[in-house]
């Protein structure tokens, strides 16, 4: 018994450490990758980065279905394999010619495989390998270190890139990725390999028929699609990223703006959670930070090339839209739907995979529109497009408000 407790404590520390390292390099493969690809292009165009995003999200949707059995039956293998693909991804950044038309495709394949193979096993281990009396401590300690990494690492990476180069900085990220893999070797599940009984597995078509039969499951499709259209790395956020790149002037400034966005997200989330027992105050917070989603693109249209507006727009989209609305409200609501409307968890994994497909569809549609406008030389229409797509956030808020939720009656799977 004592040996089991020690093993679970070690597993807890490994999960926290690996997650911190993952978030430490997230900015490197996001806003800094965008800046790198734009500079490497012949016309200083973000087209190659947008192609990378489209391919990545398309593959994430496909892999979430294709690799479903692997992530269910061989959870530990899938988790460790994700870190191997992360290493391949960074090696590709170091050795591939960034001006090559194949560069965004190769990096996108490794990135999609890493994401799909990492997160589902990670969520499974968070549930099965953490003792009930340690779960609150695990979440609070892990989240605190992750928040620190999100604030500090963009600035650190910005300084390193500004004084060397993106490719040389990739060597630092490669060390972080290798460290992740080595740490994962210290993880030994108490529940061996996380295998799921065959009787609990269902085909995707069975689950689709189940979802189409029940109105409550329709809400998962709507919410996932809307997430992809605006709040989850969608075209709206891409416009803000492209706009801030043109105003930042340096990678260090990009790092500072990204770190500021992370700090703002932490404060807003803290205020929202402090008001958890006061529904009216929570709604006040929710609606008070909603108008800038529309007003900031409008200001950018009225005052083009204004760096202050570009910076504020970027910080708002990253902190409020991406971190708060997407990572907190919508994901929490999706899990709440599954918990309230399924009597057992036999369909949960398949439903989450189908939701990932609809999320990818929403992302691809809006990013493709942004790419088309850029390729046609219609860059001046990017902000009007962002303004138009910003109205999609209102139905998202409608769906995520507890008072707007559907019936409490559960349906039988």
Which residue stretches match the model-derived regions?
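Helix-loop boundary and gating motifs at the non-cytosolic
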Residues: 2-61, 216-258
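Substrate-agnostic recognition of the 12-TM MFS/MFS-like secondary transporter fold
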Residues: 18-30, 55-64, 107-161, 223-231, ...
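Transmembrane alpha-helix termini and helix-breaking/packing motifs in multi-pass membrane transporters
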Residues: 31-41, 67-69, 152-170, 364-386
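Helix-to-loop junctions at the C-terminal end of transmembrane segments
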Residues: 62-76, 161, 267-281
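Structural signature of the two symmetry-related core transmembrane helices
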Residues: 78-93, 283-299
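Helix-loop junctions at membrane interfaces in 12-TM secondary transporters
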Residues: 95-108, 301-315, 325-329
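Symmetry-related core transmembrane helices of the 12-TM Major Facilitator Superfamily/SLC fold
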Residues: 169-186, 381-399
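Flexible cytoplasmic inter-helical loops of multi-pass small-molecule transporters
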Residues: 185-209
């Amino acid at each position: 018994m004592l040996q089991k407790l020690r093993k679970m404590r070690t597993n807890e520390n490994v999960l926290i450490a690996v997650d911190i390292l993952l978030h430490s390099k997230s900015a490197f493969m996001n806003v800094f990758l965008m800046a790198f690809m734009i500079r490497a292009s012949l016309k200083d165009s973000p087209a190659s980065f947008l192609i990378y995003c489209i391919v990545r999200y398309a593959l994430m949707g496909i892999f979430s279905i294709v690799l479903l059995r692997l992530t269910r039956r061989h959870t530990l293998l899938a988790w460790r394999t994700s870190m191997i693909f992360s290493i391949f991804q960074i090696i590709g950044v170091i050795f591939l010619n960034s001006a090559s038309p194949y560069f965004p495709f190769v990096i996108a394949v490794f990135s999609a495989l890493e994401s799909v193979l990492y997160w589902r096993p990670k969520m499974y281990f968070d549930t099965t390998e953490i003792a009930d009396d340690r779960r609150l401590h695990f979440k609070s300690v892990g989240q605190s270190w992750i928040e620190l990494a999100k604030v500090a690492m963009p600035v650190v990476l910005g300084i390193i890139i500004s004084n060397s180069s993106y490719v040389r900085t990739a060597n630092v990220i490669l060390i972080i990725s290798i460290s992740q893999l080595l740490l994962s070797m210290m993880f030994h599940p108490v529940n061996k390999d996380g295998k799921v009984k065959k009787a609990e597995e269902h085909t995707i078509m069975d689950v689709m028929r189940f979802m189409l039969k029940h109105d409550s499951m329709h809400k998962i499709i709507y919410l996932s699609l809307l997430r992809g259209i605006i709040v989850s790395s969608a075209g709206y956020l891409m416009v803000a990223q492209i706009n801030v790149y043109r105003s930042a002037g340096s990678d260090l400034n990009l790092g500072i703006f990204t770190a500021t966005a992370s700090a703002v997200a932490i404060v807003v989330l803290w205020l929202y959670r402090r008001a958890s027992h006061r529904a009216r105050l929570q709604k006040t917070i929710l609606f008070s930070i909603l108008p800038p989603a529309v007003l900031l693109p409008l200001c950018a249209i009225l005052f083009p090339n204004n760096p202050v507006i570009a910076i504020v727009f970027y910080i708002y989209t990253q902190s409020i839209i991406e971190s708060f609305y997407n990572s907190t409200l919508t994901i929490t609501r999706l899990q709440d739907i599954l918990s309230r409307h399924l009597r057992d968890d036999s369909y949960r994994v398949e439903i989450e995979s189908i939701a990932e497909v609809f999320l990818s569809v929403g992302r691809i549609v809006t990013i493709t529109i942004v790419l088309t406008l850029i390729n046609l030389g219609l860059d001046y229409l990017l902000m009007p497009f962002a303004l138009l797509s910003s109205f999609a956030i209102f139905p998202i808020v409608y769906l995520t408000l507890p008072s707007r939720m559907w019936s409490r009656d559960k349906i039988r799977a």
